[in-house]
Each structure stands twice: as structure tokens, then as C-alpha cells.
Regions:
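Alpha-helical tandem repeat RNA-binding modules
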Residues: 1-188
Length: 188
């Protein structure tokens, strides 16, 4: 019900319903947090996450990946570092959605060394992991690094998606490597 209200952009009604619940489980917390995120209410989402922690509610993979994404989008470094600390404390970094959110967060902050280091230590990677790294390189003018990551992704057998191609082309255009970027489209 809460998530449905949020999907209809009735976040105030969703919050009222949530606040009037006698008991909240991790699912109701996650639905509310996720619903707020869908409506670009990141600050409210962070407030709700803090409330969740203060009330001693359980967190899970969905909670952490969602909150990390908000920290990335808001460029909320202090909050993001605190959430990252919780992720490590609870061992959630081993879960692919959380790991991908961490790479994306570091990349959006411009911390490409941290993004790359975390990426290298991930036990499992998928196209989202690789694409987050490639797009991060592109946003920060690191065209050669984006190309190397793209090539390595293909060598590992992961099939690039449209976002990976666009991220590579974007990276190349910002680094003056447009012809090299188009080469990825010709060979794939």
C-alpha cells in the first residue's frame, strides 16, 4: 500500500500511513524508503533511514543499496561514508546490488580510485558493476581507463549493454578519443 501511494506520488499520504502503523518490519521500512527515492525525496529517505536505525529496526541488502544510491545522488559524502561503514560492519558489501551501489556512489563523488579498488575486490561482477565503473571514468574525463574497462569486461565474457556502450562513447568524447570509441561499436 505504501509503495503504491508513492508510485502515485502521494508521498505525504504514504508517510502518514507509515507513521500510523503499529509495527514496522524491514519490508515496510524498505517500501517507504524506496518509494521516497522514486519521488526524488532523498533527504526524506535519509531522515527515514536514520529513524530506522534509531528505532533499532533491522536493515537488509535492499535497505543498504537504496540508501547508498541516495547518498550518491545527493553527493552526501558524510552520510555515504557512514552508510558504507555500516555496510562493511554487516558484511553487505559481498552482495552484488550493494557492491554496485558502492561503485556508483564512489564514481559519482569523483573518487575513482576508491571505486576501482572496491570493484577489483568484488568477488562477483555483472554488467552493472562494469558499467558503473565505465560511466564513472567517463564523467571524470578518464577515457583511456573507460576503454580499458570496456575491453576487460568483454574479455571476461560479460556482454555490454546500451549503457556500457554509451558510457564508453561519452568517456571517449570527453577525452578526445571519439574514433576509438566508435571502434567499440564496429567490433561488437
Amino acid at each position: 500500500m505504501i509503495f503504491g501511494l508513492c508510485r502515485c506520488q502521494l508521498t505525504l499520504d504514504a508517510m502518514t500511513l507509515f507513521d500510523n502503523m503499529s509495527q514496522c518490519d524491514v519490508g515496510s521500512w524498505n517500501s517507504t524508503i524506496s518509494g521516497l527515492a522514486q519521488n526524488s525525496e532523498g533527504k526524506n529517505e535519509l531522515f527515514l533511514f536514520k529513524k530506522m536505525r534509531l528505532e533499532g529496526a533491522e536493515v537488509d541488502v535492499m535497505t543498504m543499496s537504496g540508501v547508498l544510491s541516495v547518498c550518491a545522488d545527493l553527493a552526501a559524502l558524510v552520510n555515504g561514508k557512514q552508510v558504507y561503514g555500516l555496510v562493511i560492519k554487516y558484511g553487505f558489501e559481498l552482495y552484488l546490488p550493494v557492491g554496485n551501489a558502492i561503485i556508483d556512489m564512489f564514481a559519482k563523488w569523483g573518487c575513482m580510485e576508491d571505486a576501482c579498488q572496491f570493484f577489483m575486490n568484488m568477488p562477483i561482477k555483472n554488467v552493472v558493476s562494469w558499467t558503473s565503473l565505465i560511466v564513472g571514468y567517463g564523467k571524470h574525463g578518464l577515457g583511456w581507463e573507460a576503454l580499458e574497462a570496456f575491453d576487460e569486461m568483454e574479455r571476461t565474457g560479460i556482454v555490454p549493454n546500451k549503457i556500457a556502450f554509451l558510457g564508453t562513447l561519452y568517456a571517449c568524447s570527453h577525452a578526445g578519443l571519439v574514433q576509438k570509441g566508435w571502434g567499440n561499436f564496429d567490433t561488437t
